[in-house]
Amino acid sequence: GAINAAALVARQLIADADEIEETRRFPATITDALIASGMLRMLLPKVYGGGEVDPGTYLQAVIALAKGDGSVAWNVFVANSAALIAPFLPETSAHAIFDDPAALIAWGPPNGQGTKVVEGGYLVNGSWDFASGCRQATWMGAHGPVIEADGNPRLNPQGKPLIRTWLFPVDQAERHDVWNPIGLRGTASDSYTVRDVFVAEDFSSTREYLEDRQISGPLYAFTMQGLYAVGVAGVALGLAQAMLVDFRALAAEKTPRGRPRLA
């Protein structure tokens, strides 16, 4: 199952963690292992080749990965969160993206930049940040308000600007290699710019309303934010558990000056 697969990948991560942090890259062997083990599509619907695992299994798998390396666990959680757009897409669009076994969507959070409505779809322009996993991505996305032809934002039923997601192949975005924080260098949470990229209506969606889903089932009855929180918690719990193991090992070996060993 997913938990055992994650534990096996985590063994590789422990050996490669220093390299990931130093190079700010995942070794090809790690990327291949994530793809082969299905770690990047645990939350993807089964009809698109995903695992469609329950939230508890997903949580334990992310915890196991985080014990090996925080950057990899983070990117696995982000990739799975992005895969949650699949139930909201037309079937042909979802297959176009996820029939590739290496499929991975990377994107940054909405930052207020809107996208104009044009005939047949949208014209995307703007820059976004924190696109974790963009170096392994096959597709990228952007989120923001929809700007109608008259220049006004499209409103949701609550009277607020409707936030929509636009998807496009990774080569249509210009990525900026700017991510370099201690401890999570490997996530490649870089910035990116999109210039005059046309996105057809079928490759755009909003994840705000469960009734818009094309695929139902127990997993997709959860809100996107609810499952997002499961992934964040898994990364934090796995890192904390690994830290405690290392601390106990250090405490058992360290000898304070003038005193016997602590354990």
Predicted regions located by residue number:
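Glycine-rich beta->alpha junctions and the first turn(s) of the following alpha-helix
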Residues: 182-263
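Buried hydrophobic positions in well-ordered alpha/beta secondary-structure cores of metabolic enzymes
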Residues: 61, 124-126, 194, 240
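A generic structural signal for beta-strand entry/edge sites
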Residues: 119-125, 139, 189
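A structural signal for short hydrophobic beta-strand segments in well-ordered beta-sheet cores
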Residues: 112-116
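Short Gly/Pro-enriched turn/cap motifs at secondary-structure boundaries
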Residues: 102-105, 181-185
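Internal helix-loop-helix
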Residues: 37-101
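Alpha-helical interface subdomain recognition
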Residues: 1-44, 50-60, 234-263
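DPxDG-like acidic metal-binding loop motif
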Residues: 127-173
